[in-house]
């Protein structure tokens, strides 16, 4: 079974970070090559669950503002994983409708890390939305998608462990992370290692650093 990955993507300039690039490049070299990739990005919240375009001719979604032009000139024309999209729809229960958006392709939470891991854009990719922020519901969604991994489909969750942008006193590169961020990160890593699903689902009440770590949830 191919692993599921959780990647931090940050803003588009993260592709200029040598450490981040080296880590993702190493992962791509060490892991089995996927038959296809299914991405869930924190940048696309849409209910009901929505499946993005499977056509490589659909432009990327440049969902960021105020950056130099060359970040908007990036292309990533990976094949669309139409068969994976069909399996996602088939895996959903009858009382949870699925929508298709033929005009939305990959956003920067999806294509930025993929340009590093699979720069030749030769692995089929499809993106789906986050249909809810409810952890229990998302856990059930993950359980429905899990069988895709048996067929070599890599599931990627893309986002940050914390996202307390309003509370960052110093957002510059190399700044010392705030305590609420480091404490939340350490707690999450510990709970994942212990497979403590109950605690992770109830992170709003149990995790240190809340609500600063995730003020929008």
For the regions a language model picked out, list residue spans one by one.
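Short, glycine/serine-rich, charged loops/turns that create anion-binding
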Residues: 11, 44, 132, 160-162
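Short, basic/glycine-rich phosphate-binding loops at helix/coil junctions
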Residues: 5-6, 63-70, 117-126, 201
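Internal, conserved structured core segments that host functional sites
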Residues: 84-138
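Secondary-structure boundary elements
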Residues: 29-34, 91-97, 133-137, 147-156, ...
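A short aromatic-anchored loop/beta-hairpin motif
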Residues: 1-99
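Surface-exposed, charge/polar-rich loops and edge strands
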Residues: 124, 133, 140, 144-154, ...
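Short acidic (Asp/Glu) patches
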Residues: 20-25, 70-73, 104-112, 138-141
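Beta-strand elements within well-structured catalytic alpha/beta cores of enzymes
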Residues: 3-7, 36-41, 128, 148-161
